[in-house]
Design a protein with these regions (language model features):
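The feature marks a conserved, polyanion-engaging helical scaffold used by nucleic-acid processing enzymes
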Residues: 1-65
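Catalytic core segments in nucleotide and nucleic-acid processing enzymes
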Residues: 43-171
Length: 171
């Protein structure tokens, strides 16, 4: 897989891109893997969802193999640890925060948490990634985003980990 990505894509060609674009490319790769390539199955055991934010974080960390970026997890530069800080030097930093849709503090976290981390890390580049496991959680996230006026925020990425994916032969 790594060789295919190196030869056929610019996935590992990071010389001309910044930390935000590199981070977004990896989040979108992870989203595609979970939603379209049966990656969602990693979050289930005996048909029941395993709702652990840490599992999603570990998968994200794997996407950074052979990178020129400095990728650090649980960086605490003040007022709490952000899930990931990806940087190339001091002037190019991006924060990535993962959340489960089932998180009871989801609205509060989306509204405030990353902005606090941005200030502590001297950056304004960040994204929030939210994983949901069913239609109820999906609607909850959409309602929260609507209430906060963030429905069209491109820095908030939703990932569908529902186990209701239909086989291509049944579409």
């Amino acid at each position: 897989m790594i060789q295919i990505l190196k030869v056929n894509t610019q996935f590992y060609d990071e010389s001309a891109i910044g930390s935000y674009d590199a981070s977004r490319a990896r989040v979108m790769y992870l989203k595609d893997f979970i939603e379209n390539k049966d990656g969602y199955k990693l979050f289930y055991h005996k048909g029941k969802p395993i709702k652990r934010e840490k599992d999603l974080q570990l998968l994200f960390k794997l996407t950074w193999f052979a990178t020129i970026f400095d990728v650090n997890a649980e960086v605490n530069n003040g007022r709490g640890p952000v899930d990931f800080k990806i940087s190339k030097g001091d002037l190019d930093k991006t924060l990535v925060e993962f959340k489960l849709a089932s998180n009871s503090k989801l609205k509060q976290n989306i509204a405030n948490q990353v902005q606090v981390y941005e200030a502590a890390n001297n950056t304004n580049q960040s994204m929030k990634v939210i994983l949901y496991f069913n239609e109820i959680e999906y609607k909850k996230v959409l309602n929260v985003l609507d209430e906060l006026g963030l429905s069209s925020d491109e820095n908030i990425i939703l990932i569908d980990a529902c186990n209701n994916k239909i086989s291509a032969s049944n579409v």
